[in-house]
Amino acid sequence: MALNVVILAAGKGTRMRSDLPKVLHPIAHKSMVQHVIDTAHCIGSDAIQLVYGYGADKLKLALGEQQLNWMLQAEQLGTGHAVAQAIPNIDDNDTVLILYGDVPLIQASTLEALLAARPDQGVAILTVNLSNPTGYGRIVREQGKVVGIVEQKDANAEQLAINEINTGIMAVPGKALKTWLGRLSNNNAQGEYYLTDIIAMAHADGVEINTAQPQSAIEVEGANNRVQLAQLERAYQAREAEKLMIAGANLRDPSRIDIRGEVTVGMDVMVDVNVIFEGKVVIGNNVSIGAGAILIDCEIADNAEIKPYSIIEGAKLGVAASAGPFARLRPGAELMQDAHIGNFVEMKKAVLGVGSKAGHLAYLGDAQIGAGVNIGAGTITCNYDGANKHLTVIEDNVFVGSDTQLVAPVTIGKGATLGAGSTITRDVGEDELVITRVKQKHLTGWQRPVKIKE
């Protein structure tokens, strides 16, 4: 029996006041609908039907490379009408799971519980109890069993008092779903084809209906405007921060970090305020991350330290390596064990060897730097000739004086010393001292120019 997921994503989202389709608005740098798609993959969906309408070009540009079946809902005539657009891709033996593109916080564990609650050939609906259920469809029960769902605008006074509400998420057998969708009517207060009406049909047909509930009501909250979007963002961040703390991270203030990807942490990780994680970030044990640091798609080994306001992107820090404050590691940069870069040092496609250091104000690009190397302040690897990049190789135990330019391609041999202010254009042999600056002159009796008064 295949799991066929239908995601409703056709709405415009007028209250967002945006040209962007509502489901493309982001939570943690990822569109709401992408969160839902990813969760569908997590539970082992065999197929995903995306019912779309407004903003088709933008949706396809954002999601087009994924394995989705695109089902157009040309007119928005209700949730039942939306699901009906997916019928051509639904087999009778499928279990159909209906999700919503603007409900991004639904968790895989909740959907797995819902699917487990569905009886053989029966229906399972996800419900939640709210102290204030205003605006939501109510779950109508008789002797404890679900017999229907009534929408707010169609409910009587007794039904309005019910606090168990419909989330819209449900699991339904494919064959029965097709039958029930064919019976839907728009004879209601909103003139729409309600998906919720199939629950009363299921009851009338003697089909067993079970319910499940999420761990938290926030999982089933949608975003219709930017205020609600911001509320979902905060809820998502709080949930992800809690995961990090449970895994072994000490967050100085859990409300002042941003997690925009997949973060894995070891034990005793210290994270100061205003740190941002993006993409896939892997952090070892006993790592310290200073305030305002940004970590993007990087790997940080045990005992490493990232000092405040450093940016680590597509890079690696080895055991006990340190970067910052105000350091920048760009893609392809790597600090080996005990290596250090300080403030205003930038690296790209460069390796700084074991125990080597660049304390301040340097650019190291397209460089292979050995162990025990000292890079003086103001050092630049001149790697670009206007058309191509070239490699600089600095072997072990080299001392590079301040304000040195290394014009690539160039190799500096082991133990060499480069005098401050030198411009190196040729290879340097092992243990050589190279000084290329102009000889210092002393002129006695020098008179400074005097400004002429007008």
Curated annotation (Swiss-Prot):
So which cofactors does this thing need?
A: Mg(2+)
- Residue segments, region N-acetyltransferase: 248-454
PROSITE patterns from the UniProt entry: HEXAPEP_TRANSFERASES
Q: Where does UDP-N-acetyl-alpha-D-glucosamine bind?
A: 8-11, 22, 73, 78-79, 100-102, 137, 151, 166, 224, 330, 348, 363, 374
Q: Gene3D superfamilies under this entry?
A: Hexapeptide repeat proteins (2.160.10.10), Spore Coat Polysaccharide Biosynthesis Protein SpsA, Chain A (3.90.550.10)
Query: Is Disulfide bond tagged as a keyword?
Result: no
Q: Where does Mg(2+) bind?
A: D102, N224
Name the keywords, alphabetized. Acyltransferase, Cell shape, Cell wall biogenesis/degradation, Cytoplasm, Magnesium, Metal-binding, Multifunctional enzyme, Nucleotidyltransferase, Peptidoglycan synthesis, Repeat, Transferase
Q: What is the catalytic activity of this protein?
A: alpha-D-glucosamine 1-phosphate + acetyl-CoA = N-acetyl-alpha-D-glucosamine 1-phosphate + CoA + H(+); N-acetyl-alpha-D-glucosamine 1-phosphate + UTP + H(+) = UDP-N-acetyl-alpha-D-glucosamine + diphosphate
* UniProt GO BP: cell morphogenesis; cell wall organization; lipid A biosynthetic process; peptidoglycan biosynthetic process; regulation of cell shape; UDP-N-acetylglucosamine biosynthetic process
User: Can you name a GO cellular component term?
Assistant: membrane
The record's family statement is:
In the N-terminal section; belongs to the N-acetylglucosamine-1-phosphate uridyltransferase family. In the C-terminal section; belongs to the transferase hexapeptide repeat family.
What protein am I looking at?
A: Bifunctional protein GlmU
